[in-house]
Amino acid sequence: MTKGETISIGEWKVVKGEGVLRTCGLGSCIGIVLYDQERVIAGMVHVMLPDSTKARKGANPWRYADTAIASLQAELKKQGARKLCAKMAGGAQMFKHAVKREFMQIGERNAAAARETLARLGITLVAEDIGGTKGRTIQYDVKTGELAVRTVHHGQMIL
């Protein structure tokens, strides 16, 4: 994986033309890429939680799947994107003891919220690598449209 624009938890970035977007440390968090391949523009966000409705006033909206995806879509359209598609990875179950407690299944809930938000916004989810018990690092090449997903102890795959 090459270096590029790095996105941390609750952050987002947009790249036009050539460039790379990457995020590390995706455990239960999800890295979501929205892109317009024809216009060669993409944005990535690293979300931590599924739903902003119970967030404290003034909380960072980029940490929540429901608000982050909608905000990233608006930013990309403002910068010229038209037909957006999505790829995403992450959503692991990082704590074995939490499997029986639904509220602790953050990865699964993050993935469901992301899928639901993408569908509501009319954004096609083209590919995903979700779940499991291992952390991930992802890197999106804006020019080629490839999302490289590196999973701990499992190597790399291209979506």
Curated annotation (Swiss-Prot):
Alphabetically ordered keywords of this record: Chemotaxis, Hydrolase
Its EC number(s): 3.5.1.44
GO biological process, one term: chemotaxis
Catalytic activity entry: L-glutaminyl-[protein] + H2O = L-glutamyl-[protein] + NH4(+)
MF (Gene Ontology): protein-glutamine glutaminase activity
Protein origin, superkingdom: Bacteria
A Pfam family hit: CheD
Classification via InterPro entries: CheD-like_sf, Chemorcpt_Glu_NH3ase_CheD, Cytotoxic_necrot_fac-like_cat
Main EC class the enzyme belongs to: hydrolase
Task of the protein: Deamidates glutamine residues to glutamate on methyl-accepting chemotaxis receptors (MCPs). CheD-mediated MCP deamidation is required for productive communication of the conformational signals of the chemoreceptors to the CheA kinase.
Entry's family note: Belongs to the CheD family.
Subunit and interaction comment: Forms a complex with CheC.
Protein name according to UniProt: Chemoreceptor glutamine deamidase CheD
Record organism: Shouchella clausii (strain KSM-K16)
